[in-house]
Curated annotation (Swiss-Prot):
PANTHER family: ATP SYNTHASE GAMMA CHAIN (PTHR11693), ATP SYNTHASE SUBUNIT GAMMA, MITOCHONDRIAL (PTHR11693:SF22). One of its GO terms (molecular function) is ATP binding. It comes from Ralstonia pickettii (strain 12J). It comes from the Bacteria. Produces ATP from ADP in the presence of a proton gradient across the membrane. The gamma chain is believed to be important in regulating ATPase activity and the flow of protons through the CF(0) complex. GO terms for biological process: proton motive force-driven plasma membrane ATP synthesis. GO terms for cellular component: plasma membrane; proton-transporting ATP synthase complex. PROSITE patterns: ATPASE_GAMMA (PS00153). It is found in: Cell inner membrane. Keywords: ATP synthesis, Cell inner membrane, Cell membrane, CF(1), Hydrogen ion transport, Ion transport, Membrane, Transport. This is ATP synthase gamma chain.
Amino acid sequence: MAGTKEIRTKIKSVQNTRKITKAMEMVAASKMRKAQERMRAARPYAEKIRNVAAHMALANPEYKHPFMVARDIKRAGLIVVTTDKGLCGGLNTNVLRAVTTQLRDLQNKGVETQTTAIGTKGMQFLGRVGAKVVSNVVHLGDTPHLEKLIGAIKVQLDAFNAGQIDAVYLAYTRFINTMKQEPVVEQLLPLTADKLAQSDAEKQAYSWDYIYEPDAQTVVDELLIRYVEALVYQAVAENMASEQSARMVAMKAASDNAKNVIGELQLVYNKTRQAAITKELSEIVSGAAAV
């Protein structure tokens, strides 16, 4: 059994670790609230631009944007959204597992793939598995800006426009609530009328004709690019909210575990100290009896 000095050292070490995890838990809780506010603030814009895009798509303009033309999938792009930092439980592991499944399914169908990494963890993973990475953006910080994302996203959008790829998928962690986050892989392109108008009522409501200024092609070109960018930004915002929630939960679990370990070590320390005192008393009594 370890001596009292060694046990005290262990207790001190665990106490110091608990202080760190407790501080990280509090920081993550603060960042989580801000991330959730950003996520909620982005939703009205994404929803409004989806509504307008649905109007454009379902009004049957004479011009049909390439983003809305379905074709046989021989090559595909995959945008992978992960975190820059760790210590967030199984968040990255879960979404990267979904990415692995998606890549395997596409390869089994003979589909070539190219990827875009948003986040350091995704960049490192795609490099390890030998995936073709055509663009990336890392170190977004705690406040994502669309300006930082546009360059990496545009590589995939331009490839789709040029016919170099036939579909684009988006992988990220969807925020459900503080305790639950869900990894998802969604098809980003091509867009469909069913995706834009999510109900029959919407389809009927958006079925009238429009007069375009300056013309349908210019309006639809600009609108659909902004819509896709909004979808990716929303995914990044949800991923960041999920990251901070997962980190807060992970740090709370670490703090609770440290508290339990300290209690167990304290019990061992007390027993060891009691045994040492008992032994000393026994030696004193034995010495006195011998005299």
